[in-house]
Amino acid sequence: ANTRVVRRSSALYDADQNSYGSDFIFKELGSYPSKKSARIASLGLILAFLVISTPLRHLIRRFLPKPGDGPDKETRENGWFKGLFKVEAEDGEIKYFQIYGDGDPGYKATAQMVCESAITLAISDELVVGGVLTSAYGLGNPLLDRLINSGIKFEEVIYN
């Protein structure tokens, strides 16, 4: 989903004569501390696919958390998320940026981002109107400011 949203944002900015650049490319990768953890994550993705799209879903769902079951309060509070972005400019300069925040990314952090998006939509007078928009294009800097003020960090990092 992230790739599609980023590409949609790029297309909207292109149409608005405010392009990401003609050579814009977005790739999404996962990083794991070991081969074992990468295999476990891959197994999780395979199981998720089976749950969603095969006749086995009825069998597999009996062993998964039920709707409304989620992590306990301690897990929600002690979780965190981090994303690392490699950006290469047209002149070849490479920089790295990261986003990170506290709270379980599947529950607390997502709820925080959704609430900040809703508040931005309700109170900002700087928003673009019309059509099917992405949060980057439709909510833009007002949302970014709210996310930063709510504790989510966006920063340039040194990465080798």
Name every feature range the model reports, one short phrase each.
Residues 1-160:
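C-terminal catalytic/substrate-binding lobe primarily of soluble NAD(P)-dependent oxidoreductases
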